[in-house]
Structure formats: C-alpha cells, structure tokens
A protein has these predicted regions:
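Early extracytoplasmic/domain-onset interaction patches
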Residues: 24-88
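Hydrophobic alpha-helical and helix-loop surface patches within well-folded domains
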Residues: 24-40, 52-53, 280, 315-554
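A surface-exposed beta-strand-loop module
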Residues: 26, 67, 77, 105-175, ...
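Short, hydrophobic/aromatic-enriched beta-strand segments in well-ordered soluble domains
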Residues: 72-74, 91, 150-164, 213-221, ...
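Solvent-exposed beta-hairpin/edge-strand motifs
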Residues: 84-126, 180-183, 218-223, 570, ...
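Glycine/proline-rich low-complexity spacer/linker segments in large multi-domain proteins
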Residues: 99-110, 159-213, 234, 612-626
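Hydrophobic helix-coil surface modules that form long, contiguous segments used
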Residues: 190, 205-386, 415
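Beta-strand-rich binding/interaction modules
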Residues: 226-227, 239, 544-609
C-alpha cells in the first residue's frame, strides 16, 4: 500500500512537473531547477540555499547637521556552492547623488553627496574603498576568495546626509526624520542570478536577504526613536511614566496616549541626558528601519494575532498633533488590520511584534513600520494604511524580489487591501475604490505599454506599464483565481505557497508550482493566460441564439483574460436572473463560450456584468430583446 501510494504521488508530481514545463521559463531559471535549488512540486529544492548576515550596528543621528553616521560589523555566511570573488555592497540612498540614474526628475532638495565610507575591513584586513564613485550598488574585490560554506567579518564606518526632500526616507520636517535604507549592506547573492546588481532608480523596489540585527540609535534628548525590532531598553531612555504606559499598551486593546503633545514640549518623555542610546534587536528579517521626532505624539495598543497561542502584537502611531489628523485613528485602524489579516486573508498570524505608523510622505512599507501621508480623508487613509500593513506578508514574510517581480508583492497587497476594504466599508465601496484606483486608468488607456505581459521583469517596464502590471493586473489575476477555486481551495493553495516559501526567496514559477500543488490541479492554462500574454479586459455578447425554453448567449473574449463575469437576464415582468461564470468557463476555449439562459419568459435584455474587471468596451456587453 505504501509503495503504491508513493508511485501514485510520483505520478501526480510528475504531472505537475510536465505541466509546469509548459510555461515559458528563462534559461537562468531553468538552470536553478536543474541544479535542484528549486523544485517543480513548488517546494524549495533539495539543494536550496540562501546567504545570511548578522549585523551589529551603532548608528547616530545628528539633528542639527542632519547627518547619519554609523559603525557596523557583518558576519556574512556564504551558504552557496559557489566561491565568491567579490562582494556587492548596496546603499539605496546613493539615489540622492547627482550622478545616480533615476526613473524621473527630482528637485535640488532631493540631491545630496551620498555615502561616505571612512573605514572598510574584511577579517581585520583594511580595504581601500572608493565609495564616492559608487551608485546604489558598489563592488569590493576580495583579496581572499570566500569559499562555499564559509564566513567573513566585514566592518564598515560610514556617514551620509539626510536629504532635505523626503520620499521613502529623509527629512519630514526640521525635527522629524524617517531613516530608511540607512546602512551599507551586502547585496543578495542567489541561486538564479548570482549577485543582485540592479541599481535602484526610485521605481522598482527592493530585494534583501533575511538577516539578524542588533543595533543602537544614538539620538539627542527629547527625540523619540521608533524602529523595527524588539525595543530592548525603554527604561534607559524613557522617563518612568512613559515607559510604563508603553509596556501597558503591549497588553490591551485600549488605545493609550503614550506621549502627549504637552509632555513632548515639556521634556517629560525621554531621559534628559544630552544623548540617549536606543537599543533594538530582531532576527530573520529583510531590513530594519527607524524614525525619530522631538514633537510627534505617540499612541499605542495591542491585539491578539494568534488565537492558538494568545500572542499579541503592538500597534503604534507617531504623528504631528497639529497636521496629522488622520493618524489620531491610526492605532485603531491597525488593530483592525492586524486582526483581520491574521484571521481572514491571508489568514496567517501577523508574524512580527509590532507595527508603527509614522506620519511622513511616502505611503511606503518597511518591516514593522509604515511611512504614510496625511490625506484628510479617513476612509482613504485607512485603505492606504491597510495596503502598507498587508505588505508584511508580501514582500517581507515571503522574501520577494520586488525589483524583478513587483507583481509578487504589490499585487498581493492590493488584493488584501481590496478584501479588507469589503469588510470595513462594504462591497460596493470597496469595488468603487478598486475600480477607480486600480483598474480604470489601465483599461481606458489603449497604449501598448498597458498590455505588456505581467511576467515582464519589473525593472525593465516603465511608466504606466510598471504600475498596472505590479498592482491592478496582478491583483486581478489573484482575485480571478480565488473566484475560480472558491475561498476554501484558494486559501489552501495560497497557504501551500506561503508555507513552502516564507523566509526564503520565491520566484514566479515557485508561485505557479505551489498553487498547482496546493489546489491539486493543473492551473497552468490560467497562469499562461494571465502572466504570459498581452491580454486585457474586454468581453462582448456576439450573438443570442433563441431556442424553445432556452437560449444560447455567445460571449466573445475580445481582450483574452480569463475573467469571471455575470450574465444578467432581465425579463419583461421586471424580474431578473444572474448567472455567474467563473474563469473556469474559459479553460476549454479562451476565445468564445456559450452560456445557456432560461427563456420561458419574454426577455427584455441580456447583459454582461464584469464587476471589478472593468470592460474596455462596455457598449457591446448588452443585447436588447425585440
């Protein structure tokens, strides 16, 4: 029996393997599967590896000069089977250098001198590093090669100025700073591309290894520091009452004003030494970020995110009490988001100890932090914050290569944003928001760049094509698959994918193969339709063929995407029937499908309702009876 089961399992997996090979696969990806680092059954292969760094950092922020400086020690492990002759060093904030390539024009306030490295050594040996000529990625040629399964210790001393104009990071106001991508890091070396040397140009986002961090932030008195990771020394840097409130907020759902506007003004929040050193630590995470201000107020509470263990996560907010009116409800919004994402979609307990919403300008996600704008519209503010918190799962929990595959990241955050929006504001409001911000612009623009295949490398796609491939089109594919499989099976398949790859570095083919395995069926026809074509959203009723008691409605798929739709039949007596079609209707014939409708009563009209899959030419979606 066991042997027969094993043979059946092999035949089943063989079916997945054969079907997966039907999808286009670049040569370097084929090589990874051939080497056994990835597997056609959706799981990491028997030879899978990823490199790792242990970062110990001491960082200082000078609020007067706006200079960030630091010392770091990196214990870097080469877990690959390759001998490394170079280190690729990534420093995203060199984007501010005048000589760095960027995806769009910037103002003078955006520009800075970039990174200065004053000391660089490997295993105690000093290196001369010309960081002034680096872009967002620099190269260090190793004096001694780094053998497989061996380690080196890299020590760096560095500094750089915070840009006056804040985007994803920089100065929010003269005394509030969001300090992201703040340290030189060893870039990713992976099994399918080797060193990641793609420059950051301010459009396509990031790709980082899972590392361990211990770090300190030295800040002037009265500046509160908010950061990724466990806050290790609140009693050393906060006054007793403030520290007590923070700890209390960790254990209850009631929003606590940890530090008020008046307390910040009166110097009653931080210890009154000239400088305070804030300590943080976190393991197995892709990045750490921090922010600080001497006048933002501070709120906090917590919520149970894992009902099996009763583990709680903290939700905090830091904002300007005068201008940040949206943020007065930020903790309440995040308590709801952490609970909803943990128990609904994706239905995996929020994996971190906290999330902090900091008032800034970027509307951007970071591990355990978001940097959001003040909108003046509480509904919109909540949806944006929901989107950024959803990024906890994609890219951070899942280790996504956002630079190459933004749709594996933004597409899921957009999907979860929509699903939580239904719970918060009702389906009609969520549909309207989704169509307005995620679909309308794309489908009403007939230009070529809108119809590039989703599988296109994100750093190679620009303009509207980048945004729509990454957000709306990718999200529509995930929601279409959910409609086709149904909630239960879709969640099973999604959890298979997330279980296979959380904490690692999946690529699109790992997603395809994992979903095939989790759903227990060959979905490659669907993935081919959505990811590897120039399809778009456009259905049409090509004809209605009457017959006794039944009529045949022939629906033509002009645009090509396998989308769900409703056939709405209006009868002469004013009553209506709605016949839902899942994307499975397109499996046998992706060009045209026949739908049978009841014609016992006289029909006034038949129409197609595509819902959020907004039709490019809605005028041909209606048939009027004679």
């Amino acid at each position: 029996m066991k042997k027969l089961f094993s043979i059946a399992l092999l035949l089943s997996l063989g079916g997945y393997m054969a079907s997966a090979q039907e999808l286009y696969m670049p040569r370097n990806i084929k090589a990874a599967y051939a080497k056994g680092t990835r597997s056609m059954n959706g799981k990491p292969g028997p030879n899978y590896w990823q490199n790792h760094g242990k970062y110990n950092m001491d960082i200082k922020v000078d609020a007067e000069t706006k200079v960030v400086s630091g010392k770091e020690e990196i214990l870097y492990s080469n877990n690959s089977s390759d001998t490394l002759k170079n280190l690729a060093i990534r420093f995203v904030n060199n984007l501010h250098k005048p000589t760095s390539p960027r995806s769009s024009a910037v103002s003078e306030d955006f520009l800075s001198t970039g990174l200065n490295i004053s000391s660089f050594s490997i295993d105690g040996e000093t290196y001369k590093v010309d960081s002034k000529n680096w872009g967002t990625v620099g190269n260090v040629k190793l004096k001694k090669t780094l053998a497989p399964k061996s380690k080196i210790t890299v020590k760096i001393e560095w500094d750089y100025p915070l840009s006056k104009e804040s985007g994803r990071e920089g100065q929010i106001d003269p005394n509030s700073f969001f300090v992201a991508y703040s340290y030189p890091r060893i870039s990713v070396y992976d099994d399918y591309n080797g060193w990641d040397r793609i420059p950051h140009t301010d459009r396509a986002e990031f790709y980082n290894d899972f590392n361990d961090y211990e770090f300190t932030i030295k800040a002037p008195k009265n500046y509160v520091v908010y950061a990724t990771g466990d806050f290790l020394n609140p009693d050393e840097v906060l006054q007793p009452e403030i520290s007590a409130r923070l700890k209390k907020s960790y254990n209850g759902n009631e929003v606590i004003h940890i530090a008020t506007e008046q307390e910040m003004k009166d110097g009653k929040v931080t210890k009154q030494k000239d400088w305070n050193t804030w300590k943080f630590a976190v393991n197995h995470i892709t990045d750490v970020t921090f922010a600080l201000s001497n006048h933002y107020v501070w709120d906090g509470a917590s919520v149970i995110v894992d009902k099996k263990t009763n583990r709680r996560s903290s939700a905090q907010a830091a904002y300007n009490p005068t201008t940040g009116k949206d943020f007065a409800n930020s903790v309440k919004y995040n308590l709801n988001a952490l609970d909803w994402f943990s128990n609904n979609w994706p239905g995996i307990p929020y994996p971190y100890v906290k999330t902090i919403a900091f008032q800034g300008f970027a509307d951007m996600e970071y591990p355990m932090m978001v940097n959001d704008s003040q909108f003046g519209d509480p509904v919109f503010a909540q949806l944006v914050q929901d989107h950024e918190v959803a990024h906890t799962y994609f890219p951070f929990y899942m280790g996504i290569n956002e630079t190459r595959y933004a749709y594996m990241d933004e597409g899921w955050a957009t999907t979860f944003e929509y699903l939580i929006g239904i719970a918060e504001h009702g389906k009609q409001a969520a549909d309207d928001f989704y169509k307005k911000f995620r679909v309308d612009q794309y489908i009403n623009d007939k230009s070529t760049e809108e119809d590039q295949p989703i599988i296109s490398m994100s750093d190679q796609v620009s303009g509207a094509g980048y945004g729509n491939n990454s957000y709306g089109k990718a999200s529509l594919s995930y929601l279409a698959l959910k409609d086709m499989l149904g909630n239960e099976l879709f969640k099973k398949a999604l959890h298979t994918y997330m279980s296979n790859w959380n904490g690692k570095h999946p690529i699109p083919w790992d997603y395809f193969n994992s979903m095939n395995a989790g759903a227990g069926q060959n979905l490659n026809w669907f993935f081919q339709n959505w990811f590897f074509t120039n399809n778009y959203l456009d259905l049409a009723i090509s004809r209605v063929t009457p017959a006794k008691g039944k009529s045949t409605v022939t629906v033509k798929n002009v645009g090509g995407f396998a989308i769900p739709f409703d056939v709405v039949v209006i009868y002469a007596d004013g009553k209506a029937d709605t016949i839902h079609q899942t994307p499975a209707v397109w499996k046998a014939n992706q060009k045209e499908v026949n739908i049978m409708v009841n014609t016992i009563k006289k029909i006034t009209s038949i129409s197609l309702d595509n819902g959020i899959y907004v039709d490019a030419t809605p005028k041909d979606n209606v048939w009027e009876g004679k």
